[in-house]
Amino acid sequence: MRITYKDIDYVYEILNGSAINKETTELKIILNGEPITLTKEDGKVWIQQAGEVTLEPDFAQALGRSVSLRYRM
């Protein structure tokens, strides 16, 4: 999938797509070749778990929202 953040295009792949439903609180994605894990806190805020690549909090939220819209979470 694609997302544009601050006028830059990114490509990401959802690794656990078949397991996503309305109760999903963790997303595993590959963003430009790097594994990223996002966790949903307080039922609405997506944050990045520790990893080699650090994303801006707003970008992590944008990725989580993008997946949420795609899978109607």
Each predicted region: which residue ranges?
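Cysteine-centric segments in proteins
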Residues: 1-73
